[in-house]
Amino acid sequence: HHAHDKMRYYRLSESRIKRIIRYPSRTEEGIIENGIACMQPTCGKIYSEIWVMYILSGLVIERKIKIITCWRYPGKSQNRDPIPSEILKEIHMLV
């Protein structure tokens, strides 16, 4: 419910969230355990970034992406911890 409330608050559609997960401009470690945060910049007069935080849940064979939250960051955020390449390969196989 939290992610749906945030999507409504920031006027983000499900397809936009899926697009951010499939084609992120930047991917970092999330603040929760095993969390992944990915970002895409928005186009417009004022620069902002849309972030999605999710975790990979389930068994190795039946992996699923569970969206924790999404938000719009006003401005440019600093680069933080990148995701290891093995996890990125696993995510690309799911999507």
How would you name each of these model-derived features?
Residues 1-95:
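Ribonuclease/tRNase effector modules and their secretory precursors
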